[in-house]
Regions:
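Histidine-rich, glycine-flanked metal-binding segment
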Residues: 1-26, 155-156
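Divalent metal-coordination and catalytic microenvironments
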Residues: 22, 33, 87, 165, ...
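Histidine-centered catalytic micro-motifs
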Residues: 28-39, 202-211
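Active-site gating loops and adjacent loop-to-helix segments of metal-dependent hydrolytic enzymes
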Residues: 40-74, 113, 127-140, 198-200, ...
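Alpha-helical scaffold segments that flank or form the walls of functional sites
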Residues: 42-113, 150-160
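Active-site core of metal-dependent hydrolases
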Residues: 131-140, 159-294
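His/Asp/Glu-enriched, well-ordered alpha-helical/loop segment
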Residues: 224-236, 274-357, 373-375
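C-terminal cap of metal-dependent C-N hydrolases
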Residues: 347-394
């Protein structure tokens, strides 16, 4: 529409009209799953597989425990800036370290325009593989099946400073502790489950990331991780689902629980390729995350490119438009955000791509061009909440 048309409408007379001729305007990307706390450990354990990021015994845990909080904050801030430069306007972080961990992240990004949902974690785990004492006092044997009162108090305090819980996984929890987390979330949001939660309080958890985690759950509990999660936790979304069974995927779809896939991180860790096409055909809402900074760059362009091309290995092509939706509106709907698409009443979180850039010109299929050709060099501007992110932010 022309500027003159808008100027003649009283509803728009006080607005600045921008001439966006020559630009492709895209909703800002929503990075639906990150761990930016481990930015300090980039590429330190790319050859160690999933054990590197294990919450109870991985090298990541040791790195975070031994690192100075100021160093962590500085590098987390750098990762947030990197995300903005790549068109990410919102990210959802699973923040380890309890209330202190949340405070470190808040301090890192307090003056940056990027939006962040911080999902905190209580550093308390159950070792369902053994009944004896664990060397870590925060890891309890299975016979202690419930979260103790002191831990519940910590969890309640955590909810008061965060946007919800980002739980490690079902294998580090008992059925009882999963129900306790669900009860805490429902109490705060005054609801009885994810469909009825009135406040934007999120409950997310990793699920079916690898064959080993799936087999472990079946061996020790007789149920899949996903079955236990749906029955006892009732989260808003699950992360990964790389090795989920057909029954798992159907269960997630039936219960309207979102899925956040992190395919490049899964590739680095050797966990496989998530069956995204099958998830979508089953009725699941699927979004994208980049996962741990220590093993993967927070780049949604690369993520979309990888998803679009690896989907063809299933023999069923995933069209580029659906891939772009996973990075934008799908994530918004899963997380109940007021962004993710260009629509009146939505937050103005946009990416301005130069249609004449050497990477894109000439554009014959805009969706395909965005998904597998665009990159940081194609971006000429990023807008968050109606304001351009200025040069000092980027």
């Amino acid at each position: 529409a022309s500027a003159a048309k808008y100027e003649s409408n009283d509803n728009y007379k006080f607005l600045n009209i921008l001439d966006a001729e020559g630009y492709l305007i895209v909703p800002g990307f929503i990075n639906a799953h990150t761990h930016i706390g481990d930015s300090i450990g980039k590429d330190m354990a790319t050859d160690r597989g999933l054990e590197a990021v294990h919450p109870m015994r991985g090298i990541k845990k040791k790195i975070l425990e031994k690192s100075n909080s100021q160093h962590l904050s500085t590098l987390m801030r750098a990762s947030a800036i990197s995300m903005m430069k790549n068109g990410i306007t919102t990210f959802v972080d699973f923040r380890e370290g309890g209330t202190e961990g949340v405070a470190i992240l808040r301090n890192a990004i307090f003056d940056l325009p990027i939006k962040c949902l911080i999902l905190g974690r209580v550093e308390y785990y159950f070792d369902i593989d053994r009944n004896g004492q664990h060397e870590d006092k925060n890891v309890q044997p299975i016979k202690k099946s419930k979260l103790p009162v002191k831990v519940l108090e910590i969890a309640t305090n955590l909810l008061n400073v965060s946007h919800g819980f980002g739980i490690s996984g079902a294998n580090e929890n008992t059925d009882s502790s999963l129900r306790q987390y669900n009860k805490l979330i429902n109490k705060l949001s005054k609801s009885d489950g994810p469909k009825n939660r009135t406040k934007n309080i999120q409950l997310g958890i990793h699920a079916a990331e690898s064959k080993s985690t799936v087999e472990f759950s079946l061996r020790r509990t007789g149920k899949t991780e996903v079955y236990r999660i749906v029955k006892h936790l009732k989260p808003n979304f699950v992360v990964h689902m790389t090795q989920a069974t057909d029954e798992d995927i159907s269960l997630i779809a039936k219960n309207e629980i979102g899925i956040v896939v992190c395919p490049r991180a899964n590739g680095v860790l050797g966990c496989g390729i998530p069956r995204i096409t099958h998830m979508l055909k089953s009725g699941c809402k699927v979004a994208i995350g980049t996962d741990n900074i220590m093993i993967n760059s927070p780049d949604m362009f690369r993520e979309m490119d990888y998803i679009w091309k690896t989907s063809r290995s299933s023999g069923i092509n995933l069209d580029a438009k659906n891939v772009l939706k996973m990075a934008t509106i799908n994530a918004s709907e899963i997380l109940h955000l007021n962004s993710g698409c260009i629509e009146i009443g939505r937050s103005a979180d946009f990416i301005f791509l130069d249609k004449t850039s050497i990477e894109l010109y000439p554009i014959h299929d805009p969706y395909a061009s965005i998904v597998h050709r665009a990159n940081q060099n194609s971006i000429k501007g990023v807008m968050i909440s109606g304001r351009f992110v200025n040069g000092s932010d980027l």
